[in-house]
Amino acid sequence: MTNIQYIKSQTQLPEKAIENTLSLLTEGCTIPFIARYRKDSTQNLDEVAIEHIAKSQADYDNICKRKETILSSIEEQGKLTDELRKRIENSFELNELEDLYLPYKKRRKTKADVAKENGLEPLAKQIMSQRVTDLELLAGRYLSDKVPTEKEALQGASDIIAEWINENTFIRRTLRRIFQRKAIISSEVAKGKNEEEEAQKYAQYFDWEEALNKAPSHRVLAMLRAEKEGFVKLKVQVDSEETLPFMEENIIKSRGEVADFLKKTVKDSYKRLLEPSISNETLQEAKDKADAKAISVFAENLSQLLLASPLGEKRILAIDPGYRTGCKVVCLDEKGDLLHHDVIYPHAPQNDMTMATKKLSSTVSQYNIQAISIGNGTASRETESFVRSIAFPKKVEVFVVSEAGASVYSASKIARDEFPDYDVTVRGAVSIGRRLADPLAELVKIDPKSIGVGQYQHDVNQSLLKEELDATVVRCVNKVGVNLNTASKSLLSYVSGIGEKMAENIVAYRSANGAFSKREDLKKVPRLGDKVYQQAVAFLRVHNSENPLDNSALHPEAYPIIKQMAKDTGISVAQLIGNKQAIATIDIQKYKTDKVGELYLKDVLKELEKPGLDPRTTAKAFAFDPNVKTFDDVRIGMILPGIVNNITAFGCFVDIGVKESGLVHISQLKDAYVSDVNEVVKLHQQVQVKVIEVDQIRKRISLTMII
């Protein structure tokens, strides 16, 4: 099987699209670049499909490397037959490869190995021929100092046969399929743990069982976590009536004494060798699927968070609320630069509301503040109420933003580099303000795992999680585009083709030489070659460039075509931009070439209509119910405004203005059946919910969605 055939079997994509995509990837093209500017080559594949191709190619390479290792190992042992080589070379399933390698794998000495050393393999072969009538008589021929009795000889032969059965690729493959279809996962409380307070969060798994292939991902991960923490014991089993008859049918071809002997051996092989092995495999496979689902949920949440509505270039006063240590206040200009910082003490124990009001009022006037951003942590509701009570001399919108990860950012190297002369409290408040202005630009500075929108994020495969989250950030950054003259090093590093080192070079060049006046100036950055320029330039915007196309998602390679389009239309390029009437008259067939296809040209016209359009909507102000500030204020039947602050596979959590977010279970999202929570709600969506349950002991709030 070629790599193209393998990838096609994994992705169900056309061979030509796969070939062209791999060719572009080999040339050093990035996934965002290929998805946006090489649609005609890939047959309009999106980033997810291209990532799938790249991953499948990596899987193919890993399988081929594993084959080489297996073949080399068996050959060194002098046991590689032509038939075995052919079976290994024709296999492209890792499980099957490992099954084929199992008899030749280096391992600890087994019962079967000892029996073979004692000369009992010929006895085992004779029994397996099933042409024997008297087992004890036959076993008597193999007695020795190490095997003094017929019983021990037969036991040794049984151990050898049990291992042969365990190494039978057909039996292993069939059992694997039976387990995949019919395995039951069960859990029971670990000895002495049922009374422990910490264990109570897993109480539902103290005596639990269900079909493994029906268990939702979050439940699989919850059970695995409970086992890891020592509170429960897990088992994955199939009724032996589903497995032993199949094995006996394939092994036993005789009757009488030999059949009875082999029946016991089959059972021993299954219980001692096969069941534990296949059970572990099946559970690992279930975990892998659960990991993939959890990672997918996390990535979708992160994407929604990164693409959250920005307020835009406004003057913002940001407040990081607090009680005893006060509320940290900073003022930011339109570019997010720090203008002023202070501390106010409107809450207990100081309760200095008069001075706090005076300071905020004068600061809003002095710095021409247009919006106030309040962190949603400790003392958030009280601070919001206090701010809204102030009669500012001009209209100022008030927003509450998530401060998850702000403390992580404030202590990070990035924050220290940005604000070397300020402490963590000022840096944290700046982050809260910048999140309102442009969530994407600020959140890329923080490890996504610190943002708090993941489901079982510490339980899943960490390398796969990082890979998917990094890919998500790259997708979001390149979807929006980046201002070349204001973007931070962190933001630039995610732009197609750039990376951390080149981002440093760009920022250093910008600091030394001033703002870029046009995209082409990017070529002056040290070590930024033609390939990086090709991959990156269209994702970078230069406002007020002498060429208006530099502030769009149009690639410079399209500029000559656009210039010709404008000329053929009888107007300038500047007049063509945004001119729907003129653009509608353009016949793209006139501009098609071997290298420029119809999909590319359609995208050019679409971008010309609305150049540089930000796919994000503008931020809207929101207010919680002023009468609900603590958990004790929440009552069953209340209808409350809220903001979706986390999405999981089993529902969504809604911030209703108290410390504890309420859960809207997937069954409470709407009247109809819901298979995917993301089809109904989005992260940070403003909603109305009704309280249906308040658990005072566990401090849990259950909600149902109204809108």
Please provide the spans of the model-predicted regions.
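Generic start-of-chain signal for non-secretory N-termini
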Residues: M1-E19, T26
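A glycine-rich phosphate-binding loop feature that marks nucleotide/adenosyl-phosphate handling sites
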Residues: R177-I184, I319-Y323, G377-E382, V401-V408, ...
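Structured, non-catalytic alpha/beta "coupling" segments that mediate domain-domain communication
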Residues: S73, R87, L100, A226-D239, ...
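Duplex nucleic acid-engaging cores and interfaces of nucleic-acid transaction enzymes
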Residues: A49-H52, D59, I63-A318, R324-Y422, ...
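Long, highly charged, low-complexity intrinsically disordered interaction regions
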Residues: D61-K79, E89, D417-A515, Q534-I561, ...
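Single-stranded RNA-binding regions, centering on S1/OB-family and related RNA-binding modules
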Residues: V542-I707
